[in-house]
């Protein structure tokens, strides 16, 4: 079996940075314990990234995943997830007498601050994203009242837009660029003028999606590896499938539909921004063995 592997597959800068920050806290805690000091409790606030194998590995190291601010105890070392958190939660965390380490992706942090600046200037946010995604909840916390979220042009068409309101358009950092541009064009037609755009889709997302499209057009099937909770991985599968090729999204090689793939001559392989290289490697080896 021939496999074309995407060069962009695997950890993005934001994920790598977040994991390095968490690793640093784990290492420091172990060093202190080795010196006879009490081992401080290490935790993340929410899953550090959306990958089950990575989360399981950290749990094995004693890293807890906290969901509520009142779970944080004095002296804890708490690492904020790569997706960011609502600013009210961040303020509450910092009031708990704990050591708080912000591992928010720099691209997400830039989007948060850009949204805040636009809203302070009197504009209202139209946000293209998944309403229940943790990154989106964080972004909305910087937008004030009146912000609207939509996940597709169909949803955008159903929003109660007011002609007299000065809107601006932004997106979840891992959203589909083509769909975002379609929303932008629809707004121009609907409102009769160009809506200001805050460019928040990161380059890594754009390049990863474009490479997935390019590979999907050359192969008999496409395999996308990454957590089922990972929005950017789901969108990779979507853009690949949109090219008309059989596409499967799996978390690891054990979930591959072997019989459906066995007859393929060439298979494309890509992975989400939170998928470890070891899992991508294992999936590639398995595919090549078919």
From Swiss-Prot:
> Keyword annotations for this protein?
4Fe-4S, Iron, Iron-sulfur, Isoprene biosynthesis, Metal-binding, Oxidoreductase
Query: Which InterPro entries does this chain map to?
Result: LytB/IspH (IPR003451)
Residues reported to bind (2E)-4-hydroxy-3-methylbut-2-enyl diphosphate: 50, 83, 133, 173, 230, 232, 274
Chain sites annotated for binding dimethylallyl diphosphate: 50, 83, 133, 230, 232, 274
Cofactor(s) named in the record: [4Fe-4S] cluster
Q: Per the UniProt record, which EC number(s) apply here?
A: 1.17.7.4
Molecular function via GO? 4 iron, 4 sulfur cluster binding; 4-hydroxy-3-methylbut-2-enyl diphosphate reductase activity; metal ion binding
Q: Which residues form the active site?
A: 135 (proton donor)
- Positions contributing to isopentenyl diphosphate binding: 50, 83, 133, 230, 232, 274
Enzymatic reactions: isopentenyl diphosphate + 2 oxidized [2Fe-2S]-[ferredoxin] + H2O = (2E)-4-hydroxy-3-methylbut-2-enyl diphosphate + 2 reduced [2Fe-2S]-[ferredoxin] + 2 H(+); dimethylallyl diphosphate + 2 oxidized [2Fe-2S]-[ferredoxin] + H2O = (2E)-4-hydroxy-3-methylbut-2-enyl diphosphate + 2 reduced [2Fe-2S]-[ferredoxin] + 2 H(+)
List the pathway annotation: Isoprenoid biosynthesis; dimethylallyl diphosphate biosynthesis; dimethylallyl diphosphate from (2E)-4-hydroxy-3-methylbutenyl diphosphate: step 1/1; Isoprenoid biosynthesis; isopentenyl diphosphate biosynthesis via DXP pathway; isopentenyl diphosphate from 1-deoxy-D-xylulose 5-phosphate: step 6/6
Amino-acid positions noted as binding [4Fe-4S] cluster in the UniProt annotation, renumbered to this chain: 12, 105, 202
* UniProt-listed Pfam families: LYTB
Q: Tell me, which GO biological process terms does this entry list?
A: dimethylallyl diphosphate biosynthetic process; isopentenyl diphosphate biosynthetic process, methylerythritol 4-phosphate pathway; terpenoid biosynthetic process
Q: How is the cofactor bound?
A: Binds 1 [4Fe-4S] cluster per subunit.
* Top EC class for this record: oxidoreductase
Superkingdom in the source lineage: Bacteria
Known role: Catalyzes the conversion of 1-hydroxy-2-methyl-2-(E)-butenyl 4-diphosphate (HMBPP) into a mixture of isopentenyl diphosphate (IPP) and dimethylallyl diphosphate (DMAPP). Acts in the terminal step of the DOXP/MEP pathway for isoprenoid precursor biosynthesis.
| Family named by the database record | Belongs to the IspH family.
Please report the name of this protein according to its UniProt entry: 4-hydroxy-3-methylbut-2-enyl diphosphate reductase
| Organism of provenance | Nitratidesulfovibrio vulgaris (strain DP4)
